[in-house]
Amino acid sequence: MPKMKTHKGAAGRFEVMKRGKLRRRRAGHNHILEKKTSKRKRRLNTETYVNPADEKRVRRLLGVR
């Protein structure tokens, strides 16, 4: 059976932490920022974790257990 390939798009977006959690950035903080409030931009700037319902799919893309 051939090796599993890492999905490079997912590899750039997610990071596996030491405890096994998957970290991601929040969407909506790249452009069109002028109309967004400072409070909203601060909130969007923080990192968060992948929802447990999506973890299995993301792990498969990354090729990690």
Curated annotation (Swiss-Prot):
<protein>
    <recommendedName>
        <fullName>Large ribosomal subunit protein bL35</fullName>
    </recommendedName>
</protein>
<keyword id="KW-0687">Ribonucleoprotein</keyword>
<dbReference type="GO" id="GO:0022625">
    <property type="term" value="C:cytosolic large ribosomal subunit"/>
</dbReference>
<dbReference type="GO" id="GO:0003735">
    <property type="term" value="F:structural constituent of ribosome"/>
</dbReference>
<dbReference type="InterPro" id="IPR037229">
    <property type="entry name" value="Ribosomal_bL35_sf"/>
</dbReference>
<dbReference type="InterPro" id="IPR001706">
    <property type="entry name" value="Ribosomal_bL35"/>
</dbReference>
<dbReference type="InterPro" id="IPR021137">
    <property type="entry name" value="Ribosomal_bL35-like"/>
</dbReference>
<dbReference type="Pfam" id="PF01632">
    <property type="entry name" value="Ribosomal_L35p"/>
</dbReference>
<comment type="similarity">
    <text>Belongs to the bacterial ribosomal protein bL35 family.</text>
</comment>
<keyword id="KW-0689">Ribosomal protein</keyword>
<dbReference type="GO" id="GO:0006412">
    <property type="term" value="P:translation"/>
</dbReference>
